[in-house]
Design a protein with these regions (language model features):
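Acidic metal-phosphate-binding loop of nucleotide-sugar-dependent transferases
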Residues: 128-129
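Conserved donor-nucleotide/metal-binding helix-loop-beta segment in metal-dependent transferases, i.e.
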Residues: 133-160
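N-terminal anchoring/stem segment of glycosyltransferases
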Residues: 37-98, 220, 242-257, 261-270
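A conserved donor-nucleotide-binding helix/loop in the catalytic core
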Residues: 56-67, 94-124
């Protein structure tokens, strides 16, 4: 009989980790893995729909605030690509439409068709700033009705601005569909679902997708005042959770100074060439 050799290795269980892969291996088709070994990720993607020639000044600080305070999986740029900023992922396509809202609408189709974007995602503008950590279940925001908002614009100027006219159009189309007219068009992040957003914007041609989507899908919401500050003198409260600005108030106003002081450290997205 051949001689037998037996080798005994004394290995502490903790040292086994050095023999294991440090990152998940790719999943190969044909192998079944129990779902309990692959917990579903709850983080959702953040979408920024950007025009091609966007000034990145506000966006830089919006991204810093997102990285600091808004849990997410990936940040996507759709459409434009500002120099010096590198997102986690990008959808590059030719935006179509006669105004910025129609351009955004065309980009939303691309987002909803993209298999790599999470099923539920947050839509951000480049002038949205998350001032406090976001925790708990998300509920979208709204402020009154579209009729209220259009009447406010009309009181300020009977000749409605292009933006006000798009809100009026959204209200009329939603009424014709038998839907509500809640004003979801506030300057705050909004949660969308890829499947239902396509169905919603196909039913209504208004470019104001927030109110179209919210009313057609009857999205739950919290009613609150819009957070946009457009003047140069308003100083936000330290406890504010979200802020929004325009180019002038961000560059020259107290609100812009407040935001820049809150987020002095560069984000992971500021790693390209030509920033600033």
């Amino acid at each position: 009989m051949a001689n037998e050799f037996r080798i005994t290795l004394n290995i502490h269980p903790d040292s086994l980790t050095s023999f294991l892969p440090q990152s998940p291996a790719p999943i190969t088709r044909g192998f079944c893995i129990e779902e309990k070994t692959m917990p579903k990720r709850t983080e959702k993607d953040i979408i920024y729909i950007l025009k091609q020639d966007i000034d990145p000044f506000e966006l830089i600080y919006s991204l810093r605030s997102v990285e600091a305070n808004f849990p997410h999986r990936k940040v996507w740029f759709v459409g434009g690509q500002p120099r010096g900023l590198v997102p986690d992922a990008r959808i590059e396509h030719r935006q179509t439409g006669s105004n910025k809202w129609e351009l955004i609408r065309s980009s939303m189709y691309e987002v909803a068709r993209n298999e790599d974007v999470t099923s539920d995602f947050f839509l951000f503008n480049d002038d949205f700033f998350v001032m406090q950590p976001v925790k708990g279940k998300w509920i979208n925001f709204a402020s009154g009705t579209l009729t209220d908002r259009v009447n406010q614009f009309a009181a300020e100027n009977p000749w409605l601005s292009p933006y006000a006219r798009t809100l009026f159009k959204a209200r009329e189309e939603l009424k014709s569909l038998g839907c509500g007219e809640v004003n979801y068009d506030v300057h705050l992040p909004m949660l969308f679902n890829k499947d239902t957003v396509i169905q919603a914007i196909r039913q209504c041609s208004s470019p104001q997708m927030r109110s179209v989507y919210g009313n057609i899908t009857k999205s739950p919401y919290k009613d609150r005042k819009d957070v946009k500050i457009g003047d140069l003198t308003t100083i936000p409260l330290e406890s504010c959770d979200f802020l929004s600005t325009n180019e002038t108030s961000f560059k020259d106003g107290k609100v812009g100074e407040f935001i820049r002081e809150r987020f002095p450290a560069p984000s992971r997205f500021e790693r390209g060439e030509g920033l600033g």
